[in-house]
Swiss-Prot record:
<dbReference type="InterPro" id="IPR027434">
    <property type="entry name" value="Homing_endonucl"/>
</dbReference>
<keyword id="KW-1133">Transmembrane helix</keyword>
<keyword id="KW-0255">Endonuclease</keyword>
<dbReference type="GO" id="GO:0022904">
    <property type="term" value="P:respiratory electron transport chain"/>
</dbReference>
<dbReference type="Pfam" id="PF03161">
    <property type="entry name" value="LAGLIDADG_2"/>
</dbReference>
<dbReference type="InterPro" id="IPR000883">
    <property type="entry name" value="Cyt_C_Oxase_1"/>
</dbReference>
<keyword id="KW-0404">Intron homing</keyword>
<dbReference type="InterPro" id="IPR023615">
    <property type="entry name" value="Cyt_c_Oxase_su1_BS"/>
</dbReference>
<feature type="region of interest" description="COX1 intron 7 encoded">
    <location>
        <begin position="324"/>
        <end position="586"/>
    </location>
</feature>
<feature type="transmembrane region" description="Helical">
    <location>
        <begin position="145"/>
        <end position="165"/>
    </location>
</feature>
<dbReference type="InterPro" id="IPR004860">
    <property type="entry name" value="LAGLIDADG_dom"/>
</dbReference>
<feature type="transmembrane region" description="Helical">
    <location>
        <begin position="387"/>
        <end position="407"/>
    </location>
</feature>
<feature type="transmembrane region" description="Helical">
    <location>
        <begin position="56"/>
        <end position="76"/>
    </location>
</feature>
<feature type="region of interest" description="COX1 exons 1 to 7 encoded">
    <location>
        <begin position="1"/>
        <end position="323"/>
    </location>
</feature>
<feature type="transmembrane region" description="Helical">
    <location>
        <begin position="303"/>
        <end position="323"/>
    </location>
</feature>
<feature type="transmembrane region" description="Helical">
    <location>
        <begin position="183"/>
        <end position="203"/>
    </location>
</feature>
<comment type="function">
    <text>Mitochondrial DNA endonuclease involved in intron homing.</text>
</comment>
Length: 586
C-alpha cells in the first residue's frame, strides 16, 4: 500500500490512473444505465417523475465520464506509461508532481459524488449554465461542491500537463529531435498544451459563478449588470478544446496501431504532426458554434461557421494519411487487423469531415438554429466516447507485450489443485539470463512466494506461484488445453513484428552462421509446423524444424534475420541481442 501511495514511478502512476479510470467508468456506466432504464419506455418508469433527480443523474454521468474516466485514462494512464519509454527518459520530469496530480483525483471524485446527495443534488447539466446553477434554482451546497470538484480536477490536469510538456521538451534521448518523436508523444504534447491554455478559463468561469452564489457578486446576474451569456463564452472557450483533449490522444494511438498492422511507417509524418497542431489551434477559435441560439449577430455566426468548416482540412489530412498507410501490400496478408483499423478510422473521423449529415448541423448556423440541441447526445456518444473506448482497448491489445514484458514466451503454467493458484515457469539459455531477470522484475510483485531459481549447465529457470488473479486465470484458460500449452487458433493475427521481436528476445538463441533458434519445446510438432507457416507467410522468413534432445525448435535462417533486423531494432529489448558481441548479424 505504501508503494502505491508514495510512488513516483511513472509506470506505477500510469497504472493507478488506469485503475481509477476503470472505477470511474463503472460509476459513470451505472448512472448511464439509470438514464436508459428511465427512457426505455414512455412515461414515468423508475424515478417517480422526479425531474430534478433525472437531471442530477445526467450531470453526474457527464462529469464522471469526461473528467474521471476518459481524461485520466487517455492522458494520465497511457501518457505516463508510454511517453517516458518512447522518448527514452528514465521517468517524468517531476515525479513527485506526477504523484500529487493523481492523488488530487480521488477527493475530486468524492466531492462530485457528494454533490449529487447534498440537498436536491446538482441538476444543472454538465455545462452548469446560470441562472439554472444560481441561487434561485439551486440554493443548497450541491453546485458549490461540484465547482470545488472541478477545481481539484482542473488543478490535477494542469499539473500533469506541465509535467508532460517539460518531459517532452527536456528529457528526450540524445539525438532524438522533435521531428523524430513518435506520434503518440506528439498527441500527448498537443493535448497538454490545450489543457494548460483552456483549464484556467474554466477555473475563472466557475470561480465567478461561485462568488455569484456566495459573495453577492453579479457576474452572471442581469439584475446586477451581469450577463449569463458571458458564462457560455467562457465555458465553451474551454469546452470545445476539451473535445480535442479527449480525442487527440486517440489520434496518436490510431497512428501507431495502423502503422504496426500495415507493416509500414505512418504516411506523411510531418503532415500528421502539423495537422494535430492545427486542430489544437483551430479548436480555440470556434467555441461559439455551440451558441448559435443565444442571439449572436450575423457576422459572428458567419465567422464561426467558416472557422468550424476549416477544421475539416487538418482532419482530412489525418484520415487520408491513415488510409494511405493501411492499404498496402501487407493489407492482403494482415487483412483482418488492417481492415478493422481502417473501418475504425473511417467511422471516427468522416463524420467530422462533413460527410455525415447529423454532424454537419453544428457547422452551419442556418441549419443549426432549427434542430438545435436534439442531436447533442448522439454527437457526443457516437464519434467521441464509443471511438475513444475502442482506442483504449486497441492500444491495450497492441501493447500487451510491452506492458507485460512477455509475448507468448516459452514458459508454461500449471494449476496447483490445493488452492487453485497458478505456477508460472520460465526457462532461458544462460546467455539470455538478463532478459529472464528483467521479465521477472516486472512480475515479481505478483509473487506469493520468492521465485525459485534453477541453474544448469545450459539453461537458467525461474518459477513462482502467482496470487489468485483473474489475468493469470484467463491466461491459463486461453492458452492451455488439458494442462498443456497450445497455440491460439488466431495466432496469425496475434503475432505482429513486435510480438516476433519479443519472442526472439525471450526465446531466441543465435547459432553458428548467424541464424536463430526459437525455442518452441512446449508445443507439439503439428503446432510448430503451424507456427513456421505463419512466419513464412506473414514475415517471409525461411524457417525449418530442428531438434534438440528430441524436441522441436524453429530455425530462422541468417538471411531472414538480416531482412528483419531493421524492424526488430525498433523495439528496445532487441538491442542487446542484435547489436551485442554475441550477435553474428551485420
Amino acid at each position: 500500500m505504501v508503494r502505491w501511495l508514495y510512488s513516483t514511478n511513472a509506470k506505477d502512476i500510469g497504472t493507478l490512473y488506469l485503475i481509477f479510470a476503470v472505477f470511474a467508468a463503472m460509476i459513470g456506466t451505472a448512472f448511464s444505465v439509470l438514464i436508459r432504464m428511465e427512457l426505455a419506455a414512455p412515461g414515468v418508469q423508475y424515478l417517480n417523475g422526479d425531474h430534478q433527480l433525472y437531471n442530477v443523474i445526467i450531470t453526474a454521468h457527464a462529469f464522471v465520464m469526461i473528467f474521471f474516466m476518459v481524461m485520466p485514462a487517455m492522458v494520465g494512464g497511457f501518457g505516463n506509461y508510454l511517453v517516458p519509454v518512447m522518448i527514452g527518459a528514465p521517468d517524468m520530469a517531476f515525479p513527485r508532481l506526477n504523484n500529487i496530480s493523481f492523488w488530487l483525483l480521488p477527493p475530486s471524485l468524492i466531492l462530485l459524488l457528494a454533490s449529487a446527495f447534498v440537498e436536491q443534488g446538482a441538476g444543472t447539466g454538465w455545462t452548469v449554465y446560470p441562472p439554472l446553477s444560481g441561487l434561485q434554482s439551486h440554493s443548497g451546497g450541491s453546485v458549490d461542491l461540484a465547482i470545488f470538484s472541478l477545481h481539484l480536477s482542473g488543478i490535477s490536469s494542469m499539473l500533469g500537463a506541465m509535467n508532460f510538456i517539460t518531459t517532452v521538451l527536456n528529457m528526450r534521448n540524445p539525438g532524438m529531435t522533435l521531428h523524430k518523436l513518435p506520434l503518440f508523444v506528439w498527441a500527448i504534447f498537443v493535448t497538454a498544451i490545450l489543457l494548460l491554455l483552456s483549464l484556467p478559463v474554466l477555473a475563472g468561469a466557475i470561480t465567478m459563478l461561485l462568488t455569484d452564489r456566495n459573495f453577492n457578486t453579479s457576474f452572471y446576474d442581469p439584475a446586477g449588470g451581469g450577463d449569463p451569456i458571458l458564462y457560455q463564452h467562457l465555458f465553451w472557450f474551454f469546452g470545445h478544446p476539451e473535445v480535442y483533449i479527449l480525442i487527440i490522444p486517440g489520434f496518436g494511438m490510431v497512428s501507431h496501431i495502423v502503422s504496426a498492422f500495415s507493416g509500414k511507417p505512418v504516411f506523411g509524418y510531418l503532415g500528421m504532426v502539423y495537422a494535430m497542431f492545427s486542430i489544437g489551434i483551430l479548436g480555440f477559435l470556434v467555441w461559439s458554434h455551440h451558441m448559435y441560439a443565444v442571439g449572436l449577430d450575423v457576422d459572428t455566426r458567419a465567422y464561426f461557421t467558416a472557422a468550424t468548416m476549416i477544421i475539416a482540412v487538418p482532419t482530412g489530412i489525418k484520415i487520408f494519411s491513415w488510409l494511405k498507410g493501411s492499404f498496402s501490400k501487407t493489407f492482403l496478408a494482415n487483412s483482418i487487423n488492417v481492415l478493422s483499423e481502417a473501418v475504425l478510422t473511417l467511422r471516427e473521423r468522416f463524420p467530422r469531415a462533413n460527410l455525415y449529415p447529423k454532424n454537419c448541423l453544428i457547422n452551419n448556423e442556418c441549419i443549426d438554429l432549427v434542430p438545435y440541441g436534439y442531436y447533442l447526445t448522439g454527437t457526443m456518444h457516437y464519434p467521441r466516447y464509443n471511438i475513444i473506448l475502442q482506442h483504449m482497448v486497441s492500444l491495450t491489445s497492441y501493447l500487451y507485450g510491452v506492458v507485460v514484458g512477455l509475448m507468448l514466451s516459452d514458459a508454461w503454467m500449471n494449476k496447483k489443485n490445493m488452492n487453485g493458484q497458478a505456477r508460472l515457469f520460465l526457462k532461458q539459455s544462460i546467455n539470455n539470463a538478463f532478459y529472464l531477470f528483467y521479465t521477472f522484475s516486472l512480475l515479481s510483485h505478483y509473487c506469493s512466494s520468492y521465485p525459485y531459481i534453477v541453474n544448469s549447465r545450459g539453461f537458467i529457470a525461474v518459477a513462482f506461484v502467482t496470487r489468485t488473479l483473474t489475468c493469470f486465470t484467463e491466461l491459463y484458460n486461453n492458452f492451455y488445453e488439458n494442462g498443456k500449452k497450445c497455440v491460439p487458433s488466431d495466432i496469425y493475427n496475434m503475432l505482429t513484428i513486435q510480438g516476433l521481436s519479443h519472442w526472439i528476445c525471450g526465446d531466441g538463441t543465435f547459432v553458428k552462421g548467424g541464424g536463430i533458434y526459437l525455442q518452441a519445446q512446449s508445443f507439439t510438432v503439428i503446432e510448430v509446423v503451424h507456427l513456421i507457416n505463419v512466419l513464412i507467410i506473414k514475415f517471409n522468413c525461411k524457417c525449418t524444424i530442428h531438434y534438440q534432445e528430441g524436441k522441436p525448435v524453429i530455425y530462422i535462417s541468417s538471411r531472414s534475420v538480416r531482412k528483419l533486423r531493421t524492424e526488430l531494432l525498433k523495439h528496445m529489448p532487441m538491442h542487446y541481442k542484435l547489436t551485442g558481441k554475441t550477435s553474428r548479424v551485420n
